Amino acid sequence: MIFNEYEEFCKKMDECIEKYKGKFGCIVTFNGFVREYDLKDGEKVPSKGMKIDEDILEKLKLVIEEAKNKFDVIDILFYHNTGFLSIGERIASIAVFARHRKEGFEALEYIINEMKKYH
């Protein structure tokens, strides 16, 4: 499930903890934020922020479905911010509900790598 409002993501996270209680062994999470620099050819370059188009949400829905089909996980929640993001702003939050940490971490790594293709 994908969200463009962080508060909705947090609310759904709490709901899923209750819904899946006893079924999941871990929740593997990731939170990404805008840095004060970018890396260009291995060099740090000052950043003023980043622009994220809203069409990324549709692309990320497909990534979530792919991850659910590829890895043995219970559920995936994904928040992604859009518009111009200033330094320090949250870009994304991901929560993977899994029976075991191995599958949870593998799914999370896959999602992050796919997401980075659109940044």
From Swiss-Prot:
InterPro entries hit by this protein: MoaE_sf (IPR036563), Mopterin_biosynth_MoaE (IPR003448)
Stretch forming the signal peptide: none
Entry-linked Pfam families: MoaE
GO cellular component, as recorded: cytosol
GO biological process: Mo-molybdopterin cofactor biosynthetic process
Protein family membership: To Synechocystis PCC 6803 slr0903.
Protein name, UniProt field: Uncharacterized protein MJ0717
